[in-house]
Curated annotation (Swiss-Prot):
PANTHER family for the chain: BIFUNCTIONAL GLUTAMINE SYNTHETASE ADENYLYLTRANSFERASE_ADENYLYL-REMOVING ENZYME, GLUTAMINE SYNTHETASE ADENYLYLTRANSFERASE
Recorded GO CC terms: cytosol
InterPro entries, sorted: GlnE, GlnE_rpt_dom, NT_sf, PII_UdlTrfase/GS_AdlTrfase
Function: Involved in the regulation of glutamine synthetase GlnA, a key enzyme in the process to assimilate ammonia. When cellular nitrogen levels are high, the C-terminal adenylyl transferase (AT) inactivates GlnA by covalent transfer of an adenylyl group from ATP to specific tyrosine residue of GlnA, thus reducing its activity. Conversely, when nitrogen levels are low, the N-terminal adenylyl removase (AR) activates GlnA by removing the adenylyl group by phosphorolysis, increasing its activity.
Keywords assigned: ATP-binding, Magnesium, Multifunctional enzyme, Nucleotide-binding, Nucleotidyltransferase, Transferase
Name of the featured protein: Bifunctional glutamine synthetase adenylyltransferase/adenylyl-removing enzyme
One annotated GO molecular function: ATP binding
Taxonomic path: Bacteria, Pseudomonadati, Pseudomonadota, Alphaproteobacteria, Hyphomicrobiales
Segments for region (Adenylyl removase): 1-474
TM region positions: none
Reactions that this protein is recorded to catalyse: [glutamine synthetase]-O(4)-(5'-adenylyl)-L-tyrosine + phosphate = [glutamine synthetase]-L-tyrosine + ADP; [glutamine synthetase]-L-tyrosine + ATP = [glutamine synthetase]-O(4)-(5'-adenylyl)-L-tyrosine + diphosphate
Length: 989
């Protein structure tokens, strides 16, 4: 059939004929070229038919070009099966979707083994993903129809898989179902869909949250089969079939961690134990999660009965205003502080960020929890339905309903389009203006400005409604007045402080008395004292939530004593309670930052800067700020002081943003490295200038600073020192410097390096700049402080140990002339790309890992670096793969661990399934390490950690609570250690 005949067959109900909208192209010529290049490889008739459809339906043509330009994932789906694309464009998408599910169900029913089921489901997922995306992009389906289709796809996937597994078990004689065609019926096995899946609101690249329960008296089990092992095995099979990545992709990632106490319970629980748990230990977040719960697979009758039994836990008999503060606290674990004066479009998380989807969901769910016990009509699952019924019952205004509903649908569309780019479960807009410009066009806007204008308006709208809900005292009760100036003899004050959690109420009461009676210089002014008194009650409550409440009070006390002019700051804190909460969080959760603030209170100026909550400054902006800081500095010592102040303020601001959740820990790592790199370059130039003024220059001299370790890989934390190597070169024929005090060759550069180290480590009134570690230089402590380039090259080629070459994978020249930088990089590349014996390298790495375990231990789950399956394992895997494969594929080289893993997976030397474990593991470890390095000076002990710290860790780990986070860490470490042992060997677990 020719292309015109094919096109003529397109009915009005077909997807192509109904395309009503489309993206805007960012680079039309490049997009057209990509599409044309692909069509050039497609059989002529098929290519002509696709081109004909695109030409006759302009929105389709633009959409295909935009996908080629902006969505690697969708373009891969298109290229994988051009005939499938044409079939989708020619058919009715609603009928086609139903037929697709029916075909897949029949194929799974006829499948003989698990591999065949996996193939069927993945083929179904690919076609559905493309069809749904086209219906979304083309404006055929409203966003909630898109979410329902995605949910239907997930529900059918779970049902098909579970039915297949139970049929297999029936064939083995382990269950005796009354209906062999539907063995789940009457089985007592219940699969609850939670969250968005339960409400029919699944997003485009979402995980599916499931909880699996079973009846201890499961009626269909064979007499000799124990329920728990059986249902755990079935649940594990369900998860494996759906989420295992293969050459043809995956179906859905499965998250089973919403079950009761996931750190210590199996993946399938008995209904008896579940009900006991919810009755005794269930928390508000679990009540909120159960609002959307729905029996989606297994024994649906038993599932509905179970939800009925759980209902009294979810829906309280009386108006439950206590849920208001609980839900707000949950929200604060996952999003930024309110009270910010700026929302950065770039890098903003449309789900948990300010004004995002989660605020709308919590706005509805909170009021459902408050009143749903007495008003059963409020017990609806979908967010929009909840807003409708809340308005109908006068819990919210119709204006609030309308504004939040429109905002919700817009933000869900943004979320979907973000995820369509690469099929990643992300909700964050790109970090750069240029990338947001591209995204805006993919989303259908003509410019970033137009998109940002609408987006910010929706954020503001959502924030306004959310903020009003949580204003004031939601219980309507009046707290008994407390005389905070009562001092240590006031028993009422002491009881109050003890009840808040202070271990030394006498000390705190004495300190409070000094504050309230104007005992400090900044509190002598009446207006300042009055403003201060207004927020002392909240301050004391906030500090009581700290890791060490008494120490937090001391830290704030030192801050007050250190302030010379505090009127402006106190007024700001009294008018901006969220900023006060932020300062209290810093003092309570991060003693290191609290001490820094007490010693140098002027670094608080950075918090007042409106840019504080905006996009993180890039290297160019940091360089400009550093230059401005040093612009009018006088003598050398003043330069050093200003550098220290700049470094401490930068560390404080980045650390505070980590704690407040306004920057990701990955962004913080880069920011820490950018700050350090800027300072290193400045110190290098400054010391060079000073040193040359004393000793002159050697002919053709060059010096370079090579960053190793976390600075080299741009993975720094708040406590990272600087691993540096100084490399130099000069005219060997004329080794003497030309200054009045001449030095020769190696002596010149050794003394120069000592001066450089001193600039970093000498303690001034502003402390030290950085601790510097030079032990990664050739021969370590036994070698010279600085290395000549040819000596460095020879050492690396002839003498260096394997561990030194592993370390070299992170080496990065951060301060040098362009010519000298290139020479050093050539040496490093030559060393890293030479052929190596994989077995020898693996053995060396395994021995090193064993030695580290012997020295540091590996049993502490919360030691993110050294625990078995921790970050050291991942680093070693990435470095091992680079050393072994760089000779054949030098493109594998990358200074960061995640970069090296991505390269290895892309080049096929690391299995995609392993990469899918290692990537999120590295991110999780890094996220938690950032927090722990910021907040804990010694080993982290969960049992003694304060509420602030646990809350920040839970947020950083994107977990609902701490037990879930701990379970995730343990599971991740086990998976990483298994990969390490398989790839490298040396099982030291």
């Amino acid at each position: 059939m020719n292309s015109s005949a094919i096109d003529a067959d397109i009915p009005p109900s077909a997807l192509a004929a109904r395309f009503a909208a489309g993206p805007q192209l960012h680079a039309p010529e490049e997009a057209e070229k990509r599409l044309a290049d692909w069509l050039g490889d497609v059989p002529a008739d098929l290519a002509g038919a696709i081109r004909s459809v695109a030409d006759r339906h302009p929105h389709v043509g633009v959409a295909l070009r935009s996908i080629a330009e902006a969505s690697p994932y969708l373009f891969d789906l298109i290229r994988a099966d051009p005939a499938r694309l044409l079939g989708l464009l020619r058919s009715d998408p609603e009928a086609g979707f139903v037929a697709l599910l029916d075909r897949a169900s029949a194929a799974v029913a006829a499948a003989s083994d698990e591999a065949e089921v996996m193939a069927v489901l993945r083929k179904m997922k690919a076609e559905a993903a493309l069809s749904i995306a086209l219906c979304d992009i083309g404006g055929l389906w409203p966003v909630m129809q898109v979410t329902q289709a995605l949910t239907d796809l997930a529900v059918n996937s779970v049902q098909m898989t579970l039915r297949f597994l139970l049929r297999q078990e029936a064939a083995r004689g382990r269950i005796i179902p009354p209906n062999s065609d539907a063995p789940e019926q009457g089985s007592g096995l219940v699969v609850l869909a939670m969250g968005k899946m339960g409400a029919g609101e699944l997003n485009y690249s979402s995980d599916i949250d499931l909880i699996v329960f079973y009846d201890l008296d499961a009626p269909t089990l064979a007499p000799d089969i124990e329920p728990q092992p059986f249902f755990v095995r079935v649940t594990q099979g369900l998860s494996r079939i759906l989420q295992q990545r293969r050459h043809d992709g995956y179906v859905f990632r499965v998250d089973l961690r919403l079950r009761p106490d996931p750190a210590s319970t199996p993946v399938a629980l008995s209904t008896v134990s579940a009900l006991n748990y919810y009755e005794r230990e269930g928390r508000t977040w679990e009540r909120a999660a159960m609002i959307k719960a729905r029996a989606c697979a297994g024994d649906l009758v038993a599932g509905e009965a179970l939800l009925g039994d759980i209902a009294p836990f979810v829906w309280r008999k009386h108006l439950d205003f206590a849920a208001l503060s609980d839900v707000h606290d949950m929200k604060r674990q996952m999003q930024t502080f309110r009270g910010q004066t700026e929302v950065a479009v770039e890098g903003h998380n449309v789900k948990v960020g300010r004004g995002g989807i989660r605020e709308i969901e919590f706005f509805a769910q909170t009021q459902q929890l408050i009143a749903g016990g007495r008003h059963p009509e409020l017990r609806v699952r979908p967010t929009l339905a909840a807003l409708d019924i809340l308005a109908a019952r006068d819990w919210i205004t119709y204006q609030a309903r309308d504004e939040l509903s429109v905002a919700y649908q817009f933000l869900r569309r943004v979320e979907h389009r973000i995820q369509m780019i690469a099929d990643e479960q992300t909700h964050t807009l790109p970090d750069s203006v240029e990338a947001v410009e591209r995204f805006s066009r993919f989303f259908g806007y003509e410019s970033r400005e137009a998109f940002a204008r609408d987006l910010l308006a929706y954020f503001d709208c959502v924030q306004g409604h959310y903020g009003k809900l949580f204003e004031g005292d939601p219980t309507g009760t009046v707290k008994l007045p407390i005389d905070y100036a009562g001092g240590p003899d006031d028993t009422g004050l002491l009881d109050h402080l003890h009840g808040l959690g202070y271990k030394k109420p006498l000390m705190v009461a004495t300190t409070l008395q000094q504050w309230m009676t104007g005992g400090y210089r900044i509190l002598k002014v009446e207006t300042t004292q009055r403003a201060f008194h207004e927020f002392v009650p909240m301050l004391i409550e906030e500090l009581a939530r700290a890791e060490e409440p008494d120490n937090a009070v001391n830290a704030f006390d030192r801050l007050l004593q250190a302030l010379h002019r505090g009127g402006r700051l106190i007024s700001l804190l009294s008018q901006n309670r969220d900023l006060l909460t932020l300062v209290a969080l810093v003092l309570g959760a991060a003693p290191r930052l609290g001490d820094m603030l007490a010693r140098q209170p002027q670094i608080l100026d950075g918090l007042i800067d409106p840019r504080f909550f905006g996009a993180m400054p890039d290297r160019a902006e940091l360089s400009a700020r550093l230059a401005a800081t040093l612009a009018d500095a006088g003598p050398y010592e003043e330069f050093l002081d200003r550098l220290r102040l700049f470094g401490q303020e930068s560390l404080f601001l980045i650390g505070t943003r980590i704690l407040s959740g306004t920057v990701s820990t990955q962004q913080a790592s880069v920011a820490f490295a950018d700050v350090a790199e800027g300072i290193v370059g400045t110190v290098h130039d400054l010391v060079s200038e000073q040193f040359i003024s004393q000793y002159g220059r050697i002919k053709d001299q060059q010096t370079a600073i090579l960053a190793m370790g976390k600075l080299g890989s741009r993975e720094m934390t708040a406590s990272s020192d600087l691993d540096l190597i100084l490399i130099y070169d000069f005219d060997h024929e004329q080794p003497d410097s030309d200054g009045e005090r001449s030095l020769q060759g190696a002596q010149y550069f050794a003394r120069f390096t000592q001066r450089l180290i001193s600039a970093f480590t000498t303690r001034t009134n502003y402390g030290v700049l950085y601790d510097v570690d030079m032990r990664l230089r050739p021969s370590g402590r036994a070698g010279p402080l600085a290395s000549r380039l040819d000596s460095f090259a020879e050492y690396q080629e002839v003498e260096a140990w394997t561990w030194e070459h592993l370390a070299l994978t992170r080496a990065r020249v951060i301060s040098a002339s362009p010519e000298f930088r290139e020479r050093i990089e050539q040496v490093i590349r030559a060393v890293l790309t030479r052929p190596r014996d994989a077995a020898i390298i693996a053995n060396d790495v395994a021995e090193m890992r064993h030695a580290i375990a012997q020295e540091k231990g590996e049993d502490d789950v919360w030691d993110m670096k050294y625990a078995a399956g921790g970050m050291v394992d991942i680093d070693f895997i990435a470095q091992y793969l680079q050393l072994v494969h760089a000779a054949a594929t030098p493109e594998i080289l990358g200074v960061s661990t995640l970069g090296a893993i991505d390269n290895a997976a892309r080049l096929g030397v690391l299995a995609q399934s392993d990469a899918e474990v290692l990537r999120p593991a590295a991110r999780l470890y890094h996220d938690l390490t950032q927090i722990l390095r910021l907040c804990v000076s010694d080993k982290f002990k969960p049992e003694t950690a304060g509420e602030d710290l646990l809350r920040v860790l839970v947020r950083a780990g994107d977990a609902p609570d701490f037990s879930s986070l701990e379970a995730r860490v343990k599971e991740t470490q086990a998976e990483v250690r298994a990969i390490f042992n398989r790839l490298i060997g040396g099982d030291s677990a």
